[in-house]
């Protein structure tokens, strides 16, 4: 085991100097011990029964077909109750599992499925009989019908050329990467509170009343609204049928058990499942079970980017918690145990990416169902309550990768709550991530969201926010590798990785640029060319998706969908906010490279462009002095106005183009800096860059500094983020910011106060997102050498935490190479 002078609590647990307290958690640890670190398996039932129904309903409105398919799945798929569990509702076999969505990527099955058990990243087992059913029954139906095939067919050649690396579109080019062919929707947050307060019988009655009020002489009412409302009625039946089947299973299991304690647990489970989600929840246990049914049935409905988030759990569960505590029918420990039963079942659902690109972008069995706590009420008051603290306690006491815990921070966040956040950060497992109300709320309001709803946002995905009854944009986004713009500028429109293929603009021989202004204008031309191709790609994506996807459950829980009688996947829903976005990949890599060229070539003339090109073409072998000069040029992340001003201008003209696309496409387009793990594969196709980075090395992630380039401490990193933002522009959104700290610098009471201070500074600067890794480099290196001794090591990756040993060596090295700040 690693021997470090100061360990985080997580590291102490790993080394045995601090024991894991299982007392009071015997139930959840029994479940966890059975499934943790097992290789997940593929469950085909969702795909099988969904396909069976879709085969029978061709020609009907897609939303209606989808609802009928969900009902078929609800009636036929096997239901399970995990031994020792207090909650019912899973969508696959016992153990860790993933499910399939052939409507998205069934055309990949023949090429990809056979390799699932042996692939390097996130392998899955599959039963041979299931494989046969998949290939003989399921895949043939979807041939020629999948969304991916349609998109690949209609993309113009010049857009395909930056999107896919092969004719079939199986592999991304990693230049302008669409994400819509491996997910049917972006991350989503259902309106759980509506289901809890009203129940699906009442929601269904609303649809029936609307149906009865239609004008059946009106063509729109007959052909669009009528089948939509019929779909809403059917999907309400579907989720209630599914719940009732769990109730019956619980009764049958109770009858067969000899353990009197377990028998009573199962009988109570049966009673709860017969009541919710059909009727309003009456207590905390019913509210939690209702939430879990909605969350898991949402997974049957669609592949929402691995993320059906939990929403503001401390808000919508609190009335039930408070009532039960006051009446003496629930203790805080019982509430915690019930929630941890949810966490441990959540950990068993593993998002399965058949698409090779999706698997590259979501390493480490990534999925992140964020629990949002803290923040403000719709009236603008501090929203912290007893449950907010309980979620933080659970994360410290029962450390797991699931759920992702996200805390909303504002200028009036209580010191006591901030202290508990600091203690959780100190633990070292990367939780919680922080989202800043002072940036998010006014920005969403300016973009058109009513202020009370902007104040009530939930965190969804890595750093995204959702307003469950106002958001209507579900389409996939695009990841743009702007380091390719830099390389194409230095290589006349070409990338070394792809040989002589012309991918960008032919901007000429870079040695002929006489001034920085000429060079920078040529860079902007390459950059904007990528943006324009990305916007064209996404325009096509947005037009195709309503032909392939529907979401009746999400729609019936969405006020605007019910008001307008439109499916959530409709192209435009009146009253909704459409926040489209694209991801900026390689921000600090580009900025540092531009700063080095400007400083060393054009201003100080210490290097010629030819010398820089020769050094890069040799991957700096034999040119180490030049590499050091480039590395020592001004770098983003150090509160250096030289680099930060370039960063701000790059962000500025990128937002200008986003605003133009917003006008052209009739939706709001934002620039975001959230890579997940895509900066690793994106970096593999990029040759050496002018900031001294070697070929194939990962790009800088999010809005963080380049690895090893931030020398002036975390406050300087925050200030660079602040100075590089264009606060006067509104085509901006989330910026993912990783900061890695040594455990020693944040140890003890003083360390907690330091964390509180840096969070307050971050909040005052109105930055969007912040998350910490607090782990010794020696621990990470030891885990690479001896993974079996470090199976429980959790680290922060992008907007999620994952087990370090579940990652590829490339991603592990990316985390190791992040700058570790030893002082605050």
From Swiss-Prot:
Binding site for (2S)-3-sulfopropanediol: 183, 187, 462, 464, 672
Record GO terms (molecular function): lyase activity
GO cellular component terms given for this protein: cytosol
Active site per the UniProt annotation: 462 (cysteine radical intermediate), 464 (proton acceptor)
Known catalytic reactions: (2S)-3-sulfopropanediol = hydroxyacetone + sulfite + H(+)
BP terms from Gene Ontology: alkanesulfonate catabolic process
Post-translational modification, as annotated: Requires the activating protein HpsH to generate the key active site glycyl radical on Gly-799 that is involved in catalysis.
Record keywords, A-Z: Lyase, Organic radical
Residue span, PFL domain: 26-694
Domain called Glycine radical: residue spans: 701-824
SUPFAM superfamilies: PFL-like glycyl radical enzymes (SSF51998)
Pathways per UniProt: Organosulfur degradation; alkanesulfonate degradation
Gene3D superfamilies per UniProt: 3.20.70.20
Enzyme class: lyase
EC number: 4.4.1.41
Family: Belongs to the glycyl radical enzyme (GRE) family.
Task of the protein: Involved in the degradation of the organosulfur compound 2(S)-dihydroxypropanesulfonate (DHPS). Catalyzes the radical-mediated C-S bond cleavage of DHPS to form sulfite and hydroxyacetone. Can also catalyze isethionate desulfonation, but with much lower efficiency.
Name of protein: (2S)-3-sulfopropanediol sulfolyase
């Amino acid at each position: 085991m690693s021997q470090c002078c100061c360990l985080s609590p997580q590291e102490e647990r790993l080394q045995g100097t601090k024991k894991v307290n299982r007392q009071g958690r015997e139930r959840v640890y029994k479940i966890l011990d059975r499934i943790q670190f097992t290789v997940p398996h593929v469950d085909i039932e969702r795909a099988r029964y969904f396909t069976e129904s879709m085969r029978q309903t061709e020609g009907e409105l897609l939303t209606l077909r989808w609802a009928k398919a969900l009902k078929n799945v609800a009636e036929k798929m096997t239901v399970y109750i995990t031994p020792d569990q207090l909650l019912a509702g899973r969508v696959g076999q016992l153990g860790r599992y993933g499910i399939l969505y052939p409507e998205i990527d069934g055309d990949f099955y023949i090429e990809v499925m056979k390799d699932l058990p042996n692939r390097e990243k996130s392998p899955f087992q599959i039963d041979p009989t299931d494989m046969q059913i998949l290939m003989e029954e399921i895949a043939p139906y979807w041939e020629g019908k999948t969304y991916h095939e349609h998109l690949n067919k209609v993309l113009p050649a010049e857009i395909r050329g930056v999107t896919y690396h092969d004719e079939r579109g199986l592999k991304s080019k990693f230049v302008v990467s669409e994400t819509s062919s491996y997910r049917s929707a972006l991350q989503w947050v259902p309106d759980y509170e509506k289901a809890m307060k009203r129940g699906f019988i009442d929601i269904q009655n609303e649809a029936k009343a609307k149906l009865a009020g239609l004008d059946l002489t009106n063509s729109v009412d007959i052909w669009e609204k009528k089948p939509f409302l019929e779909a809403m009625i059917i999907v309400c039946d579907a989720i209630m049928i599914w719940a009732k089947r769990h109730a019956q299973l619980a009764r049958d299991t109770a009858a067969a058990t000899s353990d009197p304690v377990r028998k009573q647990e199962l009988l109570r489970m049966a009673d709860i499942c017969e009541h919710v989600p059909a009727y309003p929840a009456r207590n905390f246990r019913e509210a939690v079970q209702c939430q879990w049914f909605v969350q898991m049935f949402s997974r049957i409905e669609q592949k929402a980017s691995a993320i059906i988030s939990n929403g503001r759990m401390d808000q919508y569960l609190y009335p039930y918690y408070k009532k039960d505590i006051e009446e003496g029918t629930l203790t805080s420990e019982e509430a915690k145990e019930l929630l941890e039963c949810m966490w441990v079942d959540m950990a068993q659902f593993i998002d399965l990416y058949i698409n090779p690109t999706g698997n590259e972008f979501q390493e480490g069995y990534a999925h992140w169902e964020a629990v949002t706590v803290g923040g403000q009420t719709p009236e603008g008051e501090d929203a912290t309550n007893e449950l907010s603290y309980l979620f933080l306690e659970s994360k410290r006491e029962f450390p797991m990768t699931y759920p992702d815990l996200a805390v909303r921070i504002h200028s009036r966040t209580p010191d006591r709550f901030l202290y508990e956040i600091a203690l959780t950060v100190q633990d070292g497992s990367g939780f919680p991530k922080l989202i800043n109300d002072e940036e998010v709320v006014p920005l969403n309001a300016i973009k058109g969201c009513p202020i009370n709803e902007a104040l009530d946002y939930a965190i969804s995905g890595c750093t995204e926010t959702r307003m469950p009854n106002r958001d209507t944009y579900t389409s996939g986004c695009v990841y743009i590798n702007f380091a390719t713009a830099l390389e194409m500028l230095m290589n006349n429109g070409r990338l070394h990785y792809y040989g002589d293929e012309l991918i960008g603009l032919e901007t000429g021989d870079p040695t002929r640029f006489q001034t920085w202004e000429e060079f920078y204008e040529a860079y902007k031309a390459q950059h904007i060319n990528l943006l324009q191709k990305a916007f064209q790609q996404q325009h096509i994506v947005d037009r195709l998706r309503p032909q392939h996807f529907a979401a009746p459950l999400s729609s019936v829980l969405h006020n605007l969908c019910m008001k307008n009688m439109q499916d959530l996947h409709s192209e435009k829903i009146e009253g909704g906010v459409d926040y489209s976005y694209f991801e900026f990949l390689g921000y600090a890599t580009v900025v540092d490279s531009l700063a080095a060229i400007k400083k060393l070539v054009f201003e100080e003339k210490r290097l010629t462009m030819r010398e820089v090109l020769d050094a890069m073409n040799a991957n700096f072998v034999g040119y180490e002095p030049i590499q050091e000069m480039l590395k020592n040029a001004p770098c983003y992340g150090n509160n250096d106005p030289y680099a930060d001003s370039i960063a701000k201008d790059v962000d500025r003209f990128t937002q200008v183009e986003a605003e133009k696309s917003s006008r052209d496409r009739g939706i709001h387009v934002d620039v975001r800096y959230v890579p997940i793990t895509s900066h690793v594969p994106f970096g593999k196709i990029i040759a050496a860059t002018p900031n001294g980075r070697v070929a194939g090395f990962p790009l800088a992630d999010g809005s963080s500094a380049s690895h090893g380039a931030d020398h002036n401490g975390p406050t300087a990193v925050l200030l660079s983020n602040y100075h590089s933002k264009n606060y006067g522009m509104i085509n901006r959104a989330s910026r993912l910011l990783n900061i890695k700290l040594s455990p020693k610098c944040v140890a003890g009471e003083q360390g907690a106060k330091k964390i509180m201070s840096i969070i307050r500074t971050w909040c005052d600067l109105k930055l969007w997102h912040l998350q910490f890794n607090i782990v010794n480099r020696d621990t990470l290196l030891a885990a690479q050498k001896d993974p079996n001794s470090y199976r429980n090591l959790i680290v922060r990756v992008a907007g999620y935490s994952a087990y370090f040993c579940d990652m590829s060596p490339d991603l592990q090295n990316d985390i190791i190479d992040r700058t570790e700040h030893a002082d605050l």
